[in-house]
Structure formats: structure tokens, C-alpha cells
Amino acid sequence: MRSKSLIDAGRMLACWTALAIDKSEKDPDEKVRKETGDLVELMTPIVKALLTDYGVEITYDMLQVHGGHGYIREYGMEQFSRDVRIAPIWEGTNGIQALDLAGRKMPQHMGRLLRRFFHPALDFIEQNKEDTDMKEFVVPFSKALKGLQKTTLYMAQKGLGNPYEIGAAATDYLRQFGLVAMGYMWLLMLKVAFSKREKDDYYEHKIILARFFFERILPETLSRAITISSGSKTMMSLPDEGFNSNSQFSGVV
């Protein structure tokens, strides 16, 4: 269920961003083109890094499901595992995507790009917070979104005085942001699913998967926020010689 809920949210996120690309290029309204262009700039490193990281994780999990048979050539999983591993390295590696998000996109235009995501998400919460069906999903999403906003503010403040703070937090920040974005995608899908659940079991299955995501995956944003709040001090404290893997232990107690 973890893999399925991530795949569904990831596909929705990719399609949602692709639609924004189309609007940024083709919409007749200049204001819409500008706003969706900002959204595309913000979401590009998230889509590239989040989906390829999860692609590797999911493929490895599915290999694990096969047990020892997953490791041998006849079942094909080992080929999938080797093929998917290159994805996080393409496009400049996912660490670079994280630095692009945290170091460039986050502060760009005084936070204007961030507002293209935060404002619609906040509007959705306001419009659906009293919806009986949606409430169990809107409440945890609202908390996760507030957590992301708090992390963003923390990084903006700390990064001004110490550039290492941005580098230390970048990968965790991208994952936190990506999970919140996936949560938003699930909310958009749920609006459709609840309206059609009586007509087709497919939509009921989507609701179950969404519930799994909100209960078991979205809470991972909390640990990412805690990691970010630990700062860069410890990460930058080990001198170069500390990375020497040659044992210096003498055996004398």
C-alpha cells in the first residue's frame, strides 16, 4: 500500500505540474501564464528529485517482496533495480535539485514562488474544512502545511547568517515539501473520489489509499522538520581526517 499510495500521488503531482507547464506557455491570460510559470519553477526540482528517489525506494521494496527470487535475473526485478538507480543521478543529481529548491527557489522574488503553492493549498483548506468527508484528511494536511511553512521561515532566517544551514537542510526540506505536495494531490483526488464512490469501486479504493497516506506517510514530515531544526553545527564539525576509514585503534585499553 505504501508503494501504491506513493505512485498514485506521484503521478498526480507530475500531471499537475505538466498542466501548469501548458498553462504557463499557452494560456491567453498573461497573469495566469506568469503565476503558473512561477509554480513550475518551484515544483520542477521537487518533481525531479522526489519521484526518482521514491522510484528507487519502491523498486527496491518490490524486489524485497520477491525475496531471493527478486535478486535473480529470471524474474526481471534485478533489471528494474539497475535501470531505476540512474534516475536520481540524471538531471544533475537529486542533491543539486534540493539545493536548487532551498537555496534558489525558496528565497527567489521574496518568496513569490512559494506563494504559488501555499496560497491555493490554504484556500483549499478553508473551502473544505467543514466538509464531512474531507475533514479527516484536511486536518492532518493543515498541520503538515503549517509545519512546512514554519520550516521555511526557520531556514530563511538561519540561512541569512550561515549558508551551511541551507546546505544541511536542503535534502530534508525537499522531502518535507514533496510529502506536503503529495498530500495536496491526494486532497484534489479525494474531491473527485467522494463524488463518484457510489458509482465505481475504483474511487473507493482511492479513498482507502489516501487514508493510508495520511496516516502512515504524511507524518514523516515531522521527523524531517526535527532534523532540519538541528542545524548544521554537528554536520560541519568533523574535520577532514575524521573521514579516514583506516583503523587507528591500537588495541590497548
Question: What label would you give each PLM region?
Answer:
Residues 1-8, 30-50, 68-75, 89-93, ...:
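Alpha-helix capping and helix-loop boundary segments enriched in small/acidic/polar residues
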Residues 3-14, 21, 51-58, 91, ...:
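Alpha-helical transition-metal enzyme core signature, strongest for iron centers
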Residues 6-16, 122-128, 134:
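Long, non-coiled-coil amphipathic alpha-helical linker/lever segments
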Residues 8-47, 152-168, 189-201, 205:
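C-terminal helix-coil-helix/basic helical segment that borders enzyme active sites and/or dimer interfaces
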Residues 13-16, 54-58, 117-120, 144-147, ...:
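Amphipathic, well-ordered alpha-helical segments in soluble domains
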Residues 19, 60, 103-104, 185-191:
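Short glycine/serine- and small hydrophobic-enriched flexible loop segments
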Residues 38-118, 212-252:
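Alpha-helix capping/hinge segments and adjacent helical runs
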Residues 108, 124-253:
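C-terminal amphipathic alpha-helical interaction region
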